[in-house]
């Protein structure tokens, strides 16, 4: 899978990329061979699954860009330029990817949800509500998705998970 916003960058990034192939048996071997010949990793897909395969790519492609933009907007709130925010956030992104490559999704996750740090979560929510309630809503939705990872990681217990869920599901704005 590869982002094709800039063809030259995409071409340079092709080696090692997974290429989903949905084809009948006779054509499948030819397409797999073609994918391998350009350094890609072929992945045979069951019939009809391509939309789901491509939708999964959106989470770590265009949606990731949307999350970076959300981060840049928050940085703009304290006077930083988009360039400054990206100079700080891209290394964080690289470190996150490296942690996941090293330890897997759950063990590679850090942060306040992974620690079960209710105080920090409350501070995050309060500051986000203060500047942009839609950013706070996005934070809540994404944080809820981190709870099962923290449980799998073993860094929080089910009781703490319920407390975090309650805090995140709260319709009341946190006390500032």
Residue ranges and their predicted role:
Residues 42, 48-131, 135:
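Helical "substrate-binding/catalytic lid" subdomain
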Residues 20-22, 65-68, 155-162:
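A general structural signal for short secondary-structure boundary/capping elements
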Residues 105-176:
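C-terminal active-site/capping subdomain that shapes the small-molecule cofactor and substrate pocket
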Residues 31, 71, 146:
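Aromatic/hydrophobic pocket-lining residues that form π-stacking "cages" and hydrophobic walls in ligand
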Residues 1-54:
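Rossmann-fold dinucleotide-binding core
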